[in-house]
Design a protein with these regions (language model features):
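Sequence context surrounding c-type heme c attachment/ligation sites in exported
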Residues: 6-84, 94-149
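Residue-level detector of conserved, well-ordered beta-strand and adjacent loop positions
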Residues: 87
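N-terminal secretory signal peptides that target proteins for export/translocation
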Residues: 1-2
Length: 150
């Protein structure tokens, strides 16, 4: 009896996963309307390690077309874009840019970005100490520039 119930439950789960593949994932990549203007080394690091979730130029690997991974990936990208979107950077007002720079500084310091699960799937996304130093210097310069009203 127990054995049959396990097979039934397993079959129901497989059926649900198969049915989930029929609903297309709603991935979006809106055009970049006001992209970030930053030095080339900074842009290179941000594109490599942050761009998939924090820009409108997301690279969607094949596995993001498979439910339920597709739903998780879409949720993460939408959340990342809401937090900070480098494709919309120039459209943020000065206070919003300052807030987002401070958030980036905290994320760099705590090493919470990029998330470990993203780094597992994207080995090249890891931020080295040199990458963190480059980004930190740029953030400090941007915050100083914002404070002086430039």
């Amino acid at each position: 009896m127990r054995h049959a119930m396990r097979w039934l439950a397993g079959g129901a789960i497989l059926l649900a996963l198969a049915a989930a593949q029929l609903a297309p994932a709603r991935r979006s990549d809106p055009p970049e309307s006001a992209p970030l203007a930053a030095p080339s080394p900074v842009l290179k690091i941000l594109t490599r390690s942050c761009g998939d979730c924090h820009s409108n130029d997301t690279r969607w690997p094949w596995y993001t077309s498979v439910a339920p991974v597709s739903l998780l990936a879409i949720r993460d990208v939408e959340g990342g874009r809401r937090q900070i979107n480098f494709s919309e950077w120039s459209a943020y007002n000065a206070a919003a840019r300052r807030h987002k720079l401070q958030w980036m500084h905290r994320a760099l310091g705590s090493e919470t970005m990029p998330p470990w699960e993203y780094q597992l799937a994207h080995p090249g996304s890891h931020l080295s100490a040199a990458d963190r130093a480059t980004l930190s210097r740029w953030i400090d310069a941007e915050l100083l520039s914002a404070a002086s009203g430039k």
